[in-house]
Amino acid sequence: MELELLFQNVVNSFAFYNNQVAVAVSGGVDSIVLLHLMTNWAKKNKLSLPTALTVNHGLRPESQKEADFVVSYAKELGAKESFILNWEKQNIKGNIQLQARKARYKLLAEWCKNNNVKYLLVAHHKDDQAETFLLRLERGSGVDGLSSMDYKSFLNGIYIFRPLLNFSRSEIEKYAKLHRLKWIEDRSNYDLKYRRTLYRNLLKASDNQEILTERICLTALHMKRAAKALMHYTRLAFNDCVNVHDLGYIEIKLSEFYQLPEEIALRLLLYSIMAIASKHYKPRYNSLIVIFNKILQKDSNVNCTLSGCKIRKHGENILIIRESSKIQEITLNLPLNEPTQWDNRFSCTILGNQECSVIIAPLKKTQKVPEFLKDYNCCPEVFYSLPVVLKDGKVLAYPDVNYNGKNTNDDKVQCIINSTIKQNLVSLISI
């Protein structure tokens, strides 16, 4: 069948080789077809069979039953293994679908990372692309929001592939019926309280759904090309305007910032905030533009917070600093054999042979900045977002930035930190 041949060409271009691959399977026709195609491709090429992952959001009475179906049917289709990932939701407010989507990707990416799986396949198709475009158009999205999805993207260290992007829902359903596959019909797909359902029905009601969907996807592709051009110039601006400091903050040089076209300057501010907050999702435009406009007023006193970051004017620069109150403490058992990630900004290597439980917390918790840190000529608030090692409320080790001598209260423990913010930036602006 043509769909299968085209799919094989797409997947061959991804160059998985013999790396382990996971497939996100909701139980709907598109993800079942994706798993069927992928297992057949793996068998044909004598490669490792894919693992099926399904997320139980627990939002409907039948959620567990559907997850159990996926596990059972994935085995029948030839998956290597299958797992149910449960969403431990708390106090859901606002847009449930958006929160469920964020949780789903978080659970999938975490499982892949914990199991050394680098590649995750998802079943987005051409109709999803068109519906998403219309949804975002209604919300007033800009170039990025209206851009087409990529065949390949990068999230939290995992490559996400979308091999069905060029196929329509009708082509996928035709394939499923031809191969007598079983799938679940999600009732929420027909619920008119969701805007996506409205746009799905709108496309179906058009005189020629196939042509309209194709043209919407073409417009989204034009937007993607424009977004890539803007990102190219944003990367150049980062080289000229931005300093990423070892102490875990970003400094934007205003003299250079004011010379940039507004769209590039806005993106530079946006991605600086996202890199410090280590968030994949962008802050609300309405909140961001208020801060941006304040920065453009050259005599204004900029002192704002957004996405867990402090945005401060300091001399002739804008500083993006992590809000210490938003940082999660972590508990570890010493000794450690490898570095640990802290706040997604630092890789912490803790040296010492003590066998004990310690907490890595923001320095602000100690209410004391050690003298050696004061030698760094920077805004004092920067220090409060640095990690310290605590035991029973007492400091065992302050952060050693350059690893050039003792800086601890206890000679047996030392905390060497390396900033990972540049890596955060690279993953954000390397489309």
From Swiss-Prot:
Answer whether the UniProt record assigns the keyword Cytoplasm to this protein.
Answer: yes
For this UniProt entry, the molecular function terms from Gene Ontology, in alphabetical order, are: ATP binding; tRNA(Ile)-lysidine synthase activity
Q: Which domain of life is it from?
A: Bacteria
Where it sits in the cell: the answer is: Cytoplasm
UniProt key word Nucleotide-binding: yes
| Amino acids binding ATP | S26, G27, G28, V29, D30, S31
A Pfam family annotated for this UniProt entry: ATP_bind_3
What does the UniProt keyword field contain? ATP-binding, Cytoplasm, Ligase, Nucleotide-binding, tRNA processing
E.C. numbers: 6.3.4.19
Q: Which Cys residues form disulphide pairs? A: none
Q: What class does this enzyme belong to in the EC scheme?
A: ligase
- Catalysed reaction, written as an equation: cytidine(34) in tRNA(Ile2) + L-lysine + ATP = lysidine(34) in tRNA(Ile2) + AMP + diphosphate + H(+)
| Reported function | Ligates lysine onto the cytidine present at position 34 of the AUA codon-specific tRNA(Ile) that contains the anticodon CAU, in an ATP-dependent manner. Cytidine is converted to lysidine, thus changing the amino acid specificity of the tRNA from methionine to isoleucine.
Homology family: Belongs to the tRNA(Ile)-lysidine synthase family.
Q: What is this protein called?
A: tRNA(Ile)-lysidine synthase
Tell me what organism the protein belongs to: Wolbachia sp. subsp. Drosophila simulans (strain wRi)
Q: Which gene encodes it?
A: tilS
